[in-house]
């Protein structure tokens, strides 16, 4: 059996420690600003803080771009030439052309050497699937068995983020000016739900942001009996007021602290959601009705 290489795109938002521990290879998406002629690589040539600084400097939000077909071919080739098999997952096909581009690129190599799994998710919703891949790889499963097993988890991933401001969604064309105004005036904090290969607004929470964080914790506790607690992610973007610690402290009363992974959202998630975005992500045992 060939050695299996697990590859994720940068939107999986895995921490450097997890990338090293699980031996994950990461290929970056692109980030561009309309006023600049620079093609940044997510997490390589631009960080989330640098992105936010540029938003203030330029007065515009960036655009994220998929990994193109040739980039995938160039990235896959050394591993295939070394006799390895590859399994790749990244941001869902309903949110980016990255998965489709990876699929096209995989056809340039011998059949059966590369498996592409559509996460139908983003951020550490994808990251949860990456960790599953790594664990199955370490059990000695081949690339096809890993892909078959991980696809069973795709509809079970629970990905929800509470956002503090609609400014980034508005500038990115994902909400109208009236909704943005109402959010500002009435302190509305939408919960973004990633489901069925897309993003939608679930609940809209009213009041202080801390209250919205409490609602996320309550949902976590409610889901506990139906949750795979081996890996739970708390993923945030520029939360400077301790919301991340608040959530981790609360979750650690119910599950071992070592099962909670605190990571920071990369530039692609920051592009659409903005600062003070935070989510609790986990895999359910059975799908929500």
Put a short name on every predicted segment.
Residues 5-65:
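N-terminal glycine-rich anion-binding loop in soluble enzyme alpha/beta folds
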Residues 20-21, 53, 70, 74, ...:
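Polar/charged alpha-helical tracts
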Residues 11-19, 25-32, 37-38, 84, ...:
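Mixed-charge interfacial surface used for oligomerization/domain docking
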Residues 6-7, 63, 88, 116, ...:
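Short catalytic-loop micro-motif centered on adjacent basic/acidic residues
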Residues 66, 118-120:
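Short beta->alpha junction loops
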Residues 1-3:
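Extreme N-terminus of proteins, especially the signal/transit-peptide cleavage junction
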Residues 38-88, 93-111:
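Class I S-adenosyl-L-methionine
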């Amino acid at each position: 059996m060939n050695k299996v290489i697990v590859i994720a795109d940068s939107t999986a938002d895995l921490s450097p420690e997890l990338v090293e521990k699980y031996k994950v290879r990461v290929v970056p998406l692109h980030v561009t600003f309309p006023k600049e002629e620079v093609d940044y690589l997510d997490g390589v040539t631009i960080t989330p803080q640098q992105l936010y600084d540029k938003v203030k400097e330029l007065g515009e939000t960036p655009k994220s771009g998929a990994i193109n077909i040739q980039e995938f071919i160039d990235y896959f080739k050394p591993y295939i030439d070394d006799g390895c098999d590859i399994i790749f997952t990244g941001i869902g096909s309903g949110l980016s052309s990255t998965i489709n581009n990876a699929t096209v690129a995989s056809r340039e190599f011998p059949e059966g050497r590369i498996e592409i799994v559509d996460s139908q998710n983003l951020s550490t919703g994808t990251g949860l699937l990456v960790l599953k891949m790594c664990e199955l790889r370490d059990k000695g499963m081949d690339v096809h068995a890993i892909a078959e097993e991980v696809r069973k988890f795709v509809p079970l991933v629970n990905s929800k983020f509470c956002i503090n401001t609609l400014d980034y969604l508005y500038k990115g064309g994902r909400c109208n000016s009236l909704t943005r105004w109402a959010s500002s005036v009435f302190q509305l904090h939408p919960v973004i739900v990633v489901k069925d290969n897309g993003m939608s607004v679930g609940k809209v929470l009213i009041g202080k942001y801390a209250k919205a964080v409490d609602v996320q914790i309550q949902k976590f506790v409610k889901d506990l009996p139906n949750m795979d607690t081996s890996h739970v992610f708390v993923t945030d973007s520029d939360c400077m007021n301790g919301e991340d610690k608040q959530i981790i402290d609360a979750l650690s009363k119910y599950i071992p602290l070592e099962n909670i992974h605190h990571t920071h959202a990369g530039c692609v998630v920051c592009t659409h959601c903005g600062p003070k975005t935070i989510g609790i992500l986990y895999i359910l045992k059975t799908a929500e009705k």
